[in-house]
Amino acid sequence: MKLSNKTQALHDLIAPAVQACDVNLWGIEFIPQGKRSLLRIFIDKPVDETAEPVLNEDGETELGRGIGVQDCVRVTQQVGAILDVHDPISGEYALEVSSPGWDRPFFQLEQMSAYIGQQVALRLISAVENRRKFQAKLLLVDLENEMIQVEVDGKHVLEIDSHNIDKANLIYQD
């Protein structure tokens, strides 16, 4: 779960602007696509179980948690201005801002800690037991040793080095 140098540089550049919008930068994806690249920014807010419902600027009721359209608009404006000034992406690009959603991608090992016991989808760089793709139950996140432990097929436990994880996301379950 390591960001490329370009993605890390973009992350470092936009993080203060996102934070200024009172949301958390969950992660970013930078996808170079020839003449037109894509910069996708995921933002999140901590859950506030005690929040009272309020009307937002669009007249919608918000429960004090989750990302709303106005959050995405604010971040898009702030980050867009930063990118216009610093011009870190050569050529044209599209900027997308959204919440991580129910099937949220994980960008850092620490993010997975809150989802122990949940189902995750993993794509590995190098095969483990002749497989690169897994859907498994997350059992353990070991930050010190930079590894996770998952249960595959309800019975088989694997330890996976975080540096071997190419992509990971939560599997939404109703």
UniProtKB/Swiss-Prot annotation:
Biological process (GO) annotations held by this record are: ribosomal small subunit assembly; translation
| PANTHER family reported in the protein's UniProt record | RIBOSOME MATURATION FACTOR RIMP
Q: Which InterPro entries match?
A: Ribosome_maturation_RimP, RimP_C, RimP_C_sf, RimP_N, RimP_N_sf
Q: What is its main location?
A: cytoplasm
A cellular component term (GO) from this record?
Answer: cytosol
Check the record and name the Gene3D superfamilies matching this protein.
Answer: Ribosome maturation factor RimP, C-terminal domain (2.30.30.180), RimP-like superfamily, N-terminal (3.30.300.70)
Q: List the disulfide bonds.
A: none
Belongs to which family?
Belongs to the RimP family.
Q: Where in the cell is it found?
A: Cytoplasm
* Organism listed in the record: Acinetobacter baylyi (strain ATCC 33305 / BD413 / ADP1)
The keyword Cytoplasm belongs to this UniProt entry's keyword annotation: yes
Identify the keywords attached in UniProt to this record, alphabetized: Cytoplasm, Ribosome biogenesis
According to its UniProt entry, what is the function of this protein?
Required for maturation of 30S ribosomal subunits.
Q: Does the keyword Cytoplasm apply?
A: yes
HAMAP family to which the protein is assigned, alphabetical: RimP (MF_01077)
What name does UniProt use for this protein? Ribosome maturation factor RimP
